[in-house]
A protein has these predicted regions:
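Sensory modules in modular signal-transduction proteins
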Residues: 1-32
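Sensory/regulatory domains in signal-transduction proteins
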Residues: 27, 31-116
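Non-catalytic regulatory/interaction regions at protein termini and inter-domain linkers
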Residues: 120-122
Length: 122
């Protein structure tokens, strides 16, 4: 089963970077390594962003911790690449937060408000 799941991630055309709850990068798919020009596995995601971005990342992860219903939040639209970007909670079978990742969806613009903490999108 592991190989099936890994294959899904590895064949995704979007960069996939998975972090644990302490912001440590635990996995990058091939597209992520290509996009960011190196494998950052083992590094802190917070070392890859500026202070303002780090503040938002920490706030989102805190929101994920508040409720098992808080699982996905819209973060921005990239007009140049026509994609929406989300942060997504990863949970174990007991719905405990075990990590998160950034999801890129290439499509029409999102209709939700940016960082709308009043609802989860999934």
């Amino acid at each position: 089963m592991y190989n099936l799941f890994k294959s899904v991630i590895e064949t995704d055309r979007s960069a996939v970077v998975i972090c644990d709850v302490n912001h440590k990068i635990v996995y990058m798919n091939k597209m992520a390594v290509t996009r960011y020009h190196k494998d950052l596995t083992g590094s802190s995601l917070l070392d890859c962003h500026n202070a303002k971005s780090n503040e938002i990342i920490v706030k989102v992860v805190d929101w994920f911790r508040q409720s098992p219903k808080n699982n996905m939040i819209y973060t921005y639209h990239n007009t140049k690449e026509n994609k929406d970007v989300y942060m997504v909670a990863l949970r174990d079978d007991e719905e405990n937060l075990i990590g998160y990742y950034e999801k890129h969806e290439y499509r029409n613009p999102e209709t939700a408000e940016l960082y709308d903490f009043s609802k989860s999108l999934i």
